Amino acid sequence: MARVEALSIVDALAAELRQRVFSGDLTHSDALTEAEVARTYEVARPTAKAAIEKLVGEGLLQRSAHKTARVLQLGPDDVRDIYRTRAGLESQVLRELARNNVVPADAVAANSEIATLTDGAPLSVVEPDMRFHTSLVDAAGSPRTSRIFRTLVSEVRLCMVQVQGKHLLTTSSIVAEHRQILEALADGDGERAVAVLTGHLSRARERLAAALGSEPEPAAAPPDPA
């Protein structure tokens, strides 16, 4: 494999490993060692170690006492914790945006992209869907909040890979609910935006938890539209 070329070799190598995790090329069954990474990408072992540690810090890899790293295996309880944390963080963001009738252009663009993917593979929707939500959080203008949210997004993508991109929500329902959130922001109605978000995330949360082997919790939100 060709040597990775970038201004920051550690960042470039971490980005390559991260993409392999998100594509499903690296799974929990694959042992990842500093020596293997150094040999594969023709980098020094300290560089390989730094790249692996970067993904450990992001919650994508975990390391054993013998320094072997593996993709983190998430379970139903992890999924519920991730999504409930997301819901709390995003709800506060929506209230702040609604106070000033802020409708982020990047969120509008991401939702328009999702609308074109009605026949695409489930995983093809994940990237623009995450971009929609990330754009909302970034619009709040808090670097720390954005940094925390990106960690959650990485874990959500990892969950999706584990269930091999099963359809958790229909594309049409995702687009419709995103649009309802944007309309509520434009109207300055933060509580309406939060109500839509809560139903949106709770359905995805329980379907993802069920796909990982859990019995779904009672759903408070209505089913997806046909």
Model regions: which residues?
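Alpha-helix N-cap/helix-start motif at coil-to-helix transitions, marked by capping-box chemistry
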Residues: 7-11, 83-87, 101, 108, ...
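Mobile beta-alpha loop/short-helix "lid" or hinge segments that flank ligand
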Residues: 57, 61-62, 150-155, 170-172
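Short, solvent-exposed amphipathic helices
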Residues: 84-89, 128, 151, 200-203, ...
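C-terminal regulatory/effector modules of DNA-binding transcriptional regulators
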Residues: 167-226
